[in-house]
Amino acid sequence: MKILVALSGGVDSAVSAKILKDAGYEIEGCYMKLHGRDDYHAKNIEKVQDVGNFLEIKTHILDLCDDFKREVFEPFLQTYKVGKTPNPCALCNRTIKFGKFLDFARSKGCDKIATGHYAKIENNLIKSAVDLSKDQSYFLANIEPRVIPNIVFPLGNMLKKDVKKFAASFPELEKISKSSESNEICFVENTYIDVLREFYKTETPGIVRNLQGEIVGKHNGYMNFTVGKRRGFDVFGAHEPHYVVKIDAKKNEIVVGSKADLDKNEFETQNFNAFLNIDEILKMDEIYVKIRYRSAKIACKIEISLNDNLNNESLTDKNLNFENSDFLNNQDLKAKIILKTPANGVASGQLAVFYDKSDCVIASGFIA
């Protein structure tokens, strides 16, 4: 079996390649150029070539900058522009790392691709990694279900500290083993607002309203805020903390309330991405949802229906087979999520990820 390994220049991808090589697989490496900063790429490519020389494997450089700009970066900007909170990693994994990269691997005669993500695959489902502090199953939950048989995650059963220890045992990988962690969003060096300032006038004064619609303060531009933020705006005569509850991009207004006002008992998602048959998901006794990467899982119930532009007929009691239905395009489906306990700070634009009781990802959807 021939596997193309995504090499970033970091320890996780290097160890992934080493593990697969030691296991007897025929492997090649590939570095993906996703955004600008030539000096950034030059340093990483040098590291990737060093890993390739150490493992005695062929390495490729795949320029996906145009695809990344169109599929990830521009939607990132647009999502903030309309007052929502984007999840660029979820978009990148679907369209770039497990889309274009997989296409490239096939063009090179490879059977599968491998990455340094901390996750597992079990029964054709993505599953949480052993190292829950590094688990990346959340970010992988938006990939197309059909690509899972073509993916390998060598680090799924390893702890991060053991990955570094393993790398340090080889002189050729010792330097990489001591490298710092990469940014959560690869193209954001400091904060997201610094990126937005390059394209938008982010400092535009606006008003703050309470939940009753009354003007209670002022702010310096709605793009500076996400749901749940409690600083950066002024509330006249406030004696207790206020939190952003809602953002009105068209009016350049934010709505604030107490922390309790952030609690939601239900919400809707768009682009429902199912990894199991719809009827199988609907019949599950236990389903848990994460509303953002670092949030705890919350028990929930899912009600699935067609998007408004198709039909609003509920599918809750229908016996629909996902594989043999007309719903292979996740754009067709939306879901209503009913929480067993309230969730704090549900943000439109973020990814909601659904797990079964064994920590396998069964579906995902973007919060409406």
From Swiss-Prot:
EC identifiers of the protein: 2.8.1.13
GO MF assignments: ATP binding; tRNA binding; tRNA-uridine 2-sulfurtransferase activity
Region (Interaction with tRNA): 134-136, 292-293
Signal peptide as annotated in the record: none
InterPro entries: MnmA-like, MnmA-like_C, MnmA-like_central, MnmA-like_central_sf, Rossmann-like_a/b/a_fold
Major enzyme class: transferase
Gene Ontology CC terms, in alphabetical order: cytoplasm
Disulfide bridge map: C92-C186
Active site positions, chain numbering: C92 (nucleophile), C186 (cysteine persulfide intermediate)
Catalyzed reactions: S-sulfanyl-L-cysteinyl-[protein] + uridine(34) in tRNA + AH2 + ATP = 2-thiouridine(34) in tRNA + L-cysteinyl-[protein] + A + AMP + diphosphate + H(+)
Alphabetical keyword list: ATP-binding, Cytoplasm, Disulfide bond, Nucleotide-binding, RNA-binding, Transferase, tRNA processing, tRNA-binding
Site, as annotated: Interaction with tRNA: H117, Q350
Location in the cell: Cytoplasm
Record-listed ATP binding positions: A6, L7, S8, G9, G10, V11, D12, S13, M32, G116
GO biological process, alphabetically ordered: tRNA wobble position uridine thiolation
Superkingdom of this protein's organism: Bacteria
PANTHER family in the record: MITOCHONDRIAL TRNA-SPECIFIC 2-THIOURIDYLASE 1 (PTHR11933:SF5), TRNA 5-METHYLAMINOMETHYL-2-THIOURIDYLATE -METHYLTRANSFERASE (PTHR11933)
HAMAP family in the record: tRNA_thiouridyl_MnmA
Function per UniProt: Catalyzes the 2-thiolation of uridine at the wobble position (U34) of tRNA, leading to the formation of s(2)U34.
Family classification: Belongs to the MnmA/TRMU family.
Protein name per the record: tRNA-specific 2-thiouridylase MnmA
Organism: Campylobacter hominis (strain ATCC BAA-381 / DSM 21671 / CCUG 45161 / LMG 19568 / NCTC 13146 / CH001A)
